[in-house]
Curated annotation (Swiss-Prot):
Name under which the protein is recorded: Large ribosomal subunit protein uL23
Described purpose of this protein according to its UniProt entry: One of the early assembly proteins it binds 23S rRNA. One of the proteins that surrounds the polypeptide exit tunnel on the outside of the ribosome. Forms the main docking site for trigger factor binding to the ribosome.
Subunit architecture: Part of the 50S ribosomal subunit. Contacts protein L29, and trigger factor when it is bound to the ribosome.
Species for this entry: Latilactobacillus sakei subsp. sakei (strain 23K) (Lactobacillus sakei subsp. sakei)
Record flagged with keyword Ribosomal protein: yes
PANTHER family, per the entry: 60S RIBOSOMAL PROTEIN L23A
Keywords for the protein's UniProt record, in alphabetical order: Ribonucleoprotein, Ribosomal protein, RNA-binding, rRNA-binding
Molecular-function GO terms, alphabetical: rRNA binding; structural constituent of ribosome
GO cellular component: ribonucleoprotein complex; ribosome
Family under the similarity heading: Belongs to the universal ribosomal protein uL23 family.
Disulphide bond pairs: none
Length: 94
């Protein structure tokens, strides 16, 4: 799996934006990706040093449209912690 296939998009929420001050970045990743693949993908794409990777699976939510019910897609989130001497990731480039 290529590095661009592993990392899908950054997660932009209030808590993930607050965690960026501690050099913790949250990304949606491919559901088949493991911690090692996420680490190498982040280091290759952004050119930073990764200290730690935490991964969690998010179940799909039940959504209803009238009498029809279905689920949203399940997804996988990775919280990547950078080393202290690493540069910051510019998600929103000015």
């Amino acid at each position: 799996m290529e590095a661009r296939d592993v990392i899908l998009r950054p997660v932009v929420t209030e808590s993930s934006m607050a965690a960026m001050d501690d050099k913790k970045y949250t990304f949606d990743v491919d559901v088949r990706a493991n911690k090692t693949q996420v680490r190498y993908a982040i280091e290759e794409i952004f050119g930073v040093n990764v200290k730690n990777v935490n991964i969690m699976n998010v179940r799909g939510k039940l959504k209803r449209q009238g009498r029809y019910a279905g689920y949203t897609k399940k997804r996988r989130k990775a919280i990547v912690t950078l080393t202290a001497d690493s540069k910051e990731i510019k998600i929103f480039e000015d």
